[in-house]
């Protein structure tokens, strides 16, 4: 699991307690504070060598940086999956959810956004995964966070 942000040590510690998590990669830097897509995409690409699948929630942020990750890795993105059939086959809704498509990828690395409501939440338990702090800093200098308003 990758945790990136600013002053997010407590998030990394909580992630380490999730069932099934064996290692948490943790990066704490102001460059990741506002989740600028260019910075996060470069970070994910740079730490992806040891992984065959890269998953993110199909949220506004995930839908912003995951296409960039796929492009940097020169693979297709598999969007909004609702089911995993096998290591290379997934189901996803199409036509506004009126049909379900089965998608198979032959890419060696899978870049996937996940429809989180389609899966059960991960249980937190007595698990204590290794937390590995990285010094990976990527400021692409392409975009700048100005402000957030409601």
Stretches with model-predicted labels:
Residues 1-150:
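N-terminal glycine-rich FAD/FM-binding segment characteristic of electron-transfer flavoproteins
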């Amino acid at each position: 699991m990758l945790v990136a942000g600013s002053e997010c040590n407590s998030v990394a510690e909580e992630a380490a307690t999730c069932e099934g998590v064996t290692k948490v990669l943790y990066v704490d830097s102001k460059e990741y504070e506002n989740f600028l897509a260019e910075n996060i995409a470069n970070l994910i690409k740079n730490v992806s060598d040891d992984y065959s699948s890269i998953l993110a929630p199909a949220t506004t942020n995930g839908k912003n940086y995951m296409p960039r990750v796929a492009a940097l890795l020169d693979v297709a993105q598999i969007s909004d999956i609702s089911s995993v059939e096998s290591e290379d086959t997934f189901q996803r809704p199409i036509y506004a959810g009126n049909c379900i498509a089965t998608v198979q990828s032959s890419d060696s690395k899978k870049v996937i956004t996940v429809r989180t409501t389609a899966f059960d939440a991960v249980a937190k338990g007595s698990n204590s995964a290794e937390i590995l702090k990285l010094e990976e800093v990527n400021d692409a200098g392409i975009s700048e966070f100005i402000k957030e308003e409601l």
